[in-house]
Design a protein with these regions (language model features):
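Generic helix N-cap/helix-start motif at coil->alpha-helix transitions
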Residues: 33-36, 66-74, 85, 100-107, ...
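Conserved structural position within tetratricopeptide repeats
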Residues: 64, 97-98, 128-132, 165-166
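Structural register within alpha-helical repeat arrays
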Residues: 76-80, 109-110, 144, 185
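Residue at a conserved register position within TPR or TPR-like alpha-solenoid repeats
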Residues: 80-81, 114, 148, 189
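Structural motif corresponding to the intra-repeat A-B loop/turn of tetratricopeptide repeats
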Residues: 83-84, 117, 151, 192
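TPR/TPR-like (Sel1-like) alpha-helical repeat modules
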Residues: 132, 154-172, 186-190
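Intrinsic-disorder/low-complexity signal
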Residues: 192, 199-293
Length: 293
């Protein structure tokens, strides 16, 4: 289970209103636990190696003898080596992507890691692979449009937004992610309009999704986007505002059964929250995973 967060709304008003409710005061709890107990033993062996060469040799040994098909092994190893030898770390992700070429959940995790490292070109390759194996998923088209933008391939991004917003993708109606995509396409227009002049960016269509006054004043104080790699995963996200009032959003069968079923049926795993007119100060975001993996 992995969540990708990006700070840049659908539930914004509900979030802010619930923060005003009496009784939802946040009390920070601290727990004592042994960090060493959750560190994989092979990472400890890497750390105890006498040199990076020895650590790499241990990686290859574990890969060959135990973890050849283990995606968590590759991800944890990447996290360890990325600050020591980035090229070697990237090669680990490339190997993982080859092992997981037909595993959407694993490929999303690998793509998130490439994005985290700023290697948008390799992330694009992964997202194009996801498009090939999951052509009916809404998420695939949204992710690909975003990565085109990050790679400054504005013509490709514009063309894909045109297909999405004009409902031109065969057997795919992007409804679950519609508001998120509208926000992201709008943001691209307002920040990269000069790059879109000669493209087929769907400006007129996009405007039909946004109230006139909102379009003229497009923007928001703070936007948080959550992407997760497993549509069936259950978790809770808690927002704590500067006044220590909290709001919980639960992604569980008990609390939001219809939404989870919709996500599974139409293939999307993104949620966004827009926060405006908030008190200044530090926000806290806590995430609790209810799924066992």
């Amino acid at each position: 289970f992995l969540i990708k967060m990006k700070s840049l709304a659908r539930k914004s008003q509900r979030l802010l209103n619930s923060l005003k409710i009496k009784g939802n005061d946040y009390t920070e709890q601290t727990y004592n636990f042994d960090l060493d107990s959750i560190i994989p033993y092979y990472i400890k062996d890497f750390e105890n190696a006498n040199s990076i060469v020895e650590a790499k040799n241990q990686f290859f040994k574990y890969q060959k003898e135990v973890y050849e098909l283990s995606i968590p092994f590759y991800i944890e190893s990447y996290n360890y080596f990325k600050n020591l030898d980035n090229n070697f770390a990237v090669s680990i992700l490339k190997t993982a992507s080859e092992k997981a070429k037909d595993n959407p959940k694993a490929l999303k995790t690998i793509a998130y890691k490439f994005e985290e490292s700023g290697d948008y070109e390799k992330a694009k390759i992964i997202y194009k692979r996801l498009l090939k194996i999951r052509p009916g998923d809404e998420q695939t088209y949204r992710d690909l449009a975003l990565i085109y933008k990050e790679n400054e391939e504005y013509e490709l991004a514009a063309s894909l937004y045109n297909k999405i917003l004009k409902n031109k993708i065969s057997n795919v109606n992007v409804l679950g992610l519609q508001e998120t995509i509208v926000n992201e396409a709008s943001h691209m227009y307002w920040t990269k309009a000069d790059k879109l002049i000669l493209t087929d960016f769907p400006l007129k269509t996009l405007k039909t999704f946004v109230p006139k006054n909102d379009w003229k004043n497009f923007g928001y104080d703070f936007r948080i986007v959550f992407d997760w790699n497993d549509p069936a995963v259950e978790f809770n996200i808690q927002f704590v505002d500067p006044k220590k009032k909290y709001y919980n959003w639960s992604h569980t069968i008990i609390d939001d059964k219809e939404v989870l079923e919709d996500e599974l049926n139409y293939g999307y795993n993104t949620e966004e929250f827009i926060i405006e007119k908030s008190d200044k100060g530090e926000w806290i975001v806590n995430i609790e995973n209810y799924s066992i993996e």
